[in-house]
Amino acid sequence: MASGHRVVDHIVGTLAASGVGHIFGVDGANIEDLYDAAAFRDDITAVLAKHEFAAATMADGYSRSGAGLGVVAATSGGGCLNTVPGLGEAFASRVPVLALIGQPPITLDGRGSFQDTSGRNGALDGEALFSAVSVFCRRVT
């Protein structure tokens, strides 16, 4: 079992304790630890899709079916951008979907790091983008 000291272990544990049985997504550099945390648990399953839009619509469908809260996970940059249409549909239809988006370390914000979506120094502002398709959006620091 992975050490319970990582933030991702706490996130996955909290999701599982809340009744979430599946996380849909595409693995990537800034989100891979979340999938590792899920792999060490028997009470939550990570379902990997071939595209982030597909993962977002899987989470939407999961929630619509009444199976539980739909959760989608993606990495920063292009990966997170690909979830926006699916999240927009869920938002417009008032379907609850939780999106978890990985980010580079905050010490690299605005310094040209790979797939920086911090909104600093000309980088894409992920929080502003997702605020348009969500009820609540915050970056955890």
Per-region residue spans from a language model:
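N-terminal alpha/beta PP-like core and its mobile active-site loop of ThDP/TPP-dependent enzymes
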Residues: M1-T141
